[in-house]
């Protein structure tokens, strides 16, 4: 939680420079403690597994979070019963009139298709467009990150020769950024995808900022300059066994996949995997909720015009 201090206290500038989260009395007066309302658009086939992964991360923060689950259509999912979907998920028509503090859009196993070939691409575009006026901050994961960067900023991805699967080391691309508070200079994150957007294209876009990247895996954390959209080109939510499950699933399907890099002990699939990203994943989601949802969102969600970018709010 933030440290509330008097307006114009000299310590404010010093603490901000040291990456300490402070909030002026003036800004605090416009906020009150209430649950953060977060919508999750779950595009993964195994809905329950993905729900659990994301709720685990959201539950590691000191903030109270109310979650709504959103589906892209009312058809039965391959790995999740229609009863589960009808009981726990909402359709877009149920929420389009609402505003939310945060939206998380998950990845999807669609990495080798052009976006326009995805049967529900028009629905994805509609929800992304809606989010820009109805949600304080949107977190896009993996495939959704590529989809968002394409739809909002026109950045095109390129197919890789082989699937990029494994746990890769990343480094911060900038210092003293709120989203990176508490991050080590180098940290690990899982990747599982068939495409990438060249990092040079993202760096060159004036509306985007690359916060973390990998020599092997490319851009990882990309933030829009208005602080409203965070693109996480990876899977910080993955549990320890997820890459192993994907690898053995592909083996069983006769795909002959590459062994996930830096994942199994001694790179041997017969040995257990080593999870090196859980603390980073928790910190990433905690920082997003704290600094880009709680810090920016209006108390009255009906007035989304009260949102101000972090750079402006941190000077208040």
UniProtKB/Swiss-Prot annotation:
<dbReference type="Pfam" id="PF04204">
    <property type="entry name" value="HTS"/>
</dbReference>
<feature type="site" description="Important for acyl-CoA specificity">
    <location>
        <position position="111"/>
    </location>
</feature>
<comment type="pathway">
    <text>Amino-acid biosynthesis; L-methionine biosynthesis via de novo pathway; O-succinyl-L-homoserine from L-homoserine: step 1/1.</text>
</comment>
<keyword id="KW-0012">Acyltransferase</keyword>
<dbReference type="InterPro" id="IPR033752">
    <property type="entry name" value="MetA_family"/>
</dbReference>
<keyword id="KW-0808">Transferase</keyword>
<comment type="similarity">
    <text>Belongs to the MetA family.</text>
</comment>
<feature type="binding site">
    <location>
        <position position="192"/>
    </location>
    <ligand>
        <name>substrate</name>
    </ligand>
</feature>
<dbReference type="GO" id="GO:0019281">
    <property type="term" value="P:L-methionine biosynthetic process from homoserine via O-succinyl-L-homoserine and cystathionine"/>
</dbReference>
<keyword id="KW-0028">Amino-acid biosynthesis</keyword>
<dbReference type="InterPro" id="IPR029062">
    <property type="entry name" value="Class_I_gatase-like"/>
</dbReference>
<feature type="binding site">
    <location>
        <position position="249"/>
    </location>
    <ligand>
        <name>substrate</name>
    </ligand>
</feature>
<feature type="binding site">
    <location>
        <position position="163"/>
    </location>
    <ligand>
        <name>substrate</name>
    </ligand>
</feature>
<feature type="active site" description="Proton acceptor">
    <location>
        <position position="235"/>
    </location>
</feature>
<keyword id="KW-0486">Methionine biosynthesis</keyword>
<comment type="function">
    <text>Transfers a succinyl group from succinyl-CoA to L-homoserine, forming succinyl-L-homoserine.</text>
</comment>
<dbReference type="GO" id="GO:0005737">
    <property type="term" value="C:cytoplasm"/>
</dbReference>
<feature type="site" description="Important for substrate specificity">
    <location>
        <position position="192"/>
    </location>
</feature>
<keyword id="KW-0963">Cytoplasm</keyword>
<feature type="active site" description="Acyl-thioester intermediate">
    <location>
        <position position="142"/>
    </location>
</feature>
<protein>
    <recommendedName>
        <fullName>Homoserine O-succinyltransferase</fullName>
        <ecNumber>2.3.1.46</ecNumber>
    </recommendedName>
</protein>
<dbReference type="InterPro" id="IPR005697">
    <property type="entry name" value="HST_MetA"/>
</dbReference>
<feature type="active site">
    <location>
        <position position="237"/>
    </location>
</feature>
<dbReference type="GO" id="GO:0004414">
    <property type="term" value="F:homoserine O-acetyltransferase activity"/>
</dbReference>
<dbReference type="GO" id="GO:0008899">
    <property type="term" value="F:homoserine O-succinyltransferase activity"/>
</dbReference>
């Amino acid at each position: 939680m933030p440290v509330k201090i008097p307006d114009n206290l000299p310590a404010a500038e010093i603490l901000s420079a040291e990456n300490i989260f402070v909030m002026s009395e003036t800004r605090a007066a416009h906020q009150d403690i209430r649950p953060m309302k977060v919508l999750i658009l779950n595009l993964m086939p195994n809905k329950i597994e993905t729900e659990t992964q994301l709720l685990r991360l959201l539950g590691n923060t000191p903030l109270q979070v109310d979650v709504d689950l959103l589906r892209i259509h009312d058809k039965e999912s391959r790995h999740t019963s229609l009863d589960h979907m009808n009981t726990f998920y909402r359709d877009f028509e149920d929420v389009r009139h609402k505003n939310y503090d945060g939206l998380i859009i998950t990845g999807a196993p669609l990495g080798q298709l052009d976006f326009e070939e995805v049967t529900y691409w028009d629905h994805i575009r509609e929800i992304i467009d809606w989010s820009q006026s109805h949600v304080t901050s949107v977190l896009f994961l993996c495939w959704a990150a590529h989809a968002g960067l394409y739809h909002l900023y026109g950045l095109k991805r390129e197919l890789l020769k082989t699937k990029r699967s494994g746990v890769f080391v990343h480094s911060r691309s900038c210092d003293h950024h709120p989203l990176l508070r508490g991050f080590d200079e180098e940290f690990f994150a899982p990747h599982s995808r068939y495409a990438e957007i060249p990092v040079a294209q993202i760096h060159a876009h004036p509306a985007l900022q690359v916060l973390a990247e990998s020599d092997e895996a490319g851009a990882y954390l990309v933030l829009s300059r208005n602080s409203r959209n965070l693109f996480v080109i990876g899977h910080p939510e993955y549990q320890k066994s997820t890459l192993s499950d994907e690898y053995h699933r592909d083996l069983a399907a006769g795909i002959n996949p590459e062994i996930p890099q830096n994942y199994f002990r001694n790179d041997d699939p017969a040995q257990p995997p080593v999870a090196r990203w859980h603390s980073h994943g928790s910190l990433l989601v905690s920082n997003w909720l704290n600094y880009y949802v709680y810090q920016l969102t209006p108390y009255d969600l009906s007035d989304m015009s009260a949102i101000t970018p972090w750079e402006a709010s941190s000077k208040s």
